[in-house]
Amino acid sequence: MSKTLNDNLKEYKVSEIPHIRLMGRNVKGALKSGGPVPLFWGAACLDVRAKSGEVWALVETDYSVYEVWACVWVNGRIISRFMLEKGRNWVCLCRGFAPETVNDVRIMRDSQAMCEDPDQIFLVHSFAIEKNGAFLPLKEKKLRIEFVGDSVTSGEGLYGAVDETQWISAWISPSKTYAVKAAEAMDAEFSLVSACGWGIVAAWNNNIECVIPPIYGQVCGLCKGEPQQNLGSCKEFDFDEKPNDFVFVNLGANDYGAFFNEPWIHGGKEYKMHTNPDGSFDEADCMKVSCGIRDFLKVIRKNNPQAKICWVWDMLEMPELSTYMHKGVSMYIAESGDKNVDIRLLPPSSLEKEDEDKGSRNHPGPLTHKLAAAKIIEYCKNTLGYSK
């Protein structure tokens, strides 16, 4: 990383680049604002197609607790991943190519959106290429897919040794998730709306405020810090600007975990998903999950009137709650008459036998994400009538 730019390079603000693609939720008109572009969610990214021997990006980050990680893609493959320093710095995305080489280059946020750090931001100000280089048109993507989820969709556990237990930014890698793998295979634009520990009606620790449905309509509503809100995190998101073709929801694992954890105390009141004396799940609390699924599907459909919606789960197995997950989707379909909603169970992490296949922090590893991506791809192709 560098504070200055080499003399052989020319800087272009994001708004000055004629051909550039932004993926991941953002404020309306972010590419043409004249200012830096924030990357709010995990796997949010900027793509350029550059004729140049090297490509740089001017980025800016800040944080108080959890640093931001980024990764670089060249021609569809990740070539580097690194922790970003605080402040504004030039980052070399790639170099050493012949000047006439044309590369598809992507800089991606490889950290999830962090509600735990109200100061955390990631901005891209500019790109730089050789003075005789050029930005060329990008190939249009065929589809748009949104993935809504928790730590699995955020990529927790996809870096680090199997026995790692500390919760740090380094172990979270959205770029390696089933979601990004599936979207790339489908040649789709993608966006992730996901946060570790968050649920449908309860977070992993029974916190009823760390749930996705209430913030779904916002750009990145879980980030409520002043610098984050100044960038537009809590603004209403414009779903019509780029309508989704598919919305996959992978939530429920933290609601499941809440049954095994201590109550959350807030305002003198106790919140808890209960188990019975025999260890079974309390029926009323299970029904809270079913009703939460039904109600959230109404919100998703309202904002995505034409999309195929599919609720998926089981990468982290939750046998006691699975019936109620099914029930929630069935309740929505029965009440709405919406036939454009499906359920799919994804391969569980219990299939991982070798350390190289496993993730850190007791989360799904590379094998499970690969198998889950294959299921998503198969579902998309079947829905669209693609031949295998």
Where are these regions (language model features)?
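Surface-exposed acidic, glycine-flexible loop patches that form ligand/cofactor-binding
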Residues: 136-138, 231-243, 298-304, 383-388
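Active-site segments of SGNH/GDSL-like serine hydrolases
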Residues: 253-255, 264, 293-328
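N-terminal secretory targeting modules
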Residues: 1-174, 388
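A structural motif corresponding to the C-terminal end of an alpha-helix
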Residues: 179-189, 296-308, 332-338
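Extracytoplasmic/secreted proteins, especially bacterial periplasmic and envelope-associated proteins
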Residues: 177, 181, 284, 288, ...
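Catalytic His-Asp segment of secreted/periplasmic serine-dependent ester chemistry enzymes
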Residues: 265, 314-388
